[in-house]
Each structure stands twice: as C-alpha cells, then as structure tokens.
Amino acid sequence: MAQKKKSSGSGLMSSAGLMTYYDADKKAIHVQPKTVFIFGAICGIVILAFSAGFGLWP
C-alpha cells in the first residue's frame, strides 16, 4: 500500500496565517447577531405594512 507523506510545516503556516488575519480583523466594525436579527425583523414589518397599505397584500 502507498503511505501518505506528512508535511510538517503546512499546519503551522496555516494557523499562523489565520492568526495574522484575525489580528487585522480587530479594526473592523463588529455587529452583534441580535442587532442584525432585529434590523431584519423591522425591515420585514415595514415592507409588510407598505404592501398592506398600498393594496399589494396577497
């Protein structure tokens, strides 16, 4: 049977790259999932209200 070769450096390089990416990501805007859910619910309610108000309700 053929044996698989283990690459010793690929895992370390991969994790180091991810750590660098997440360190740089700290400057980004962070939004909580609850905020996104509430914003989506409000947008949905507003769209339904406009649809009902203009006679487009199914």
Curated annotation (Swiss-Prot):
Keyword Hydrolase tagged: no
Instruction: Give the record's membrane topology.
Output: Single-pass membrane protein
What is its subcellular localisation?
A: Cell membrane
Q: Does the keyword Transmembrane apply?
A: yes
**Per its UniProt entry, which superkingdom is the organism in?**
Archaea
Indicate the transmembrane segments per the record.
33-54
Keyword annotations: Cell membrane, Membrane, Protein transport, Translocation, Transmembrane, Transmembrane helix, Transport
Among InterPro entries, the record links this protein to: Preprot_translocase_SecG, SecG/Sec61-beta/Sbh
Report the main location listed first in the record.
membrane
The record places the following residue ranges in the Cytoplasmic compartment, namely 1-32
Give me the Gene Ontology terms describing cellular component.
plasma membrane
Record topological domains on the Extracellular side: 55-58
* Single biological process term from Gene Ontology: protein transport
Q: How is the quaternary structure described?
A: Component of the protein translocase complex. Heterotrimer consisting of alpha (SecY), beta (SecG) and gamma (SecE) subunits. Can form oligomers of the heterotrimer.
**Function, as annotated:** Involved in protein export. The function of the beta subunit is unknown, but it may be involved in stabilization of the trimeric complex.
Q: Which family does the entry's similarity section mention?
A: Belongs to the SEC61-beta family.
Would you tell me the protein name for this molecule?
Preprotein translocase subunit SecG
Which gene produces this protein? Answer: secG
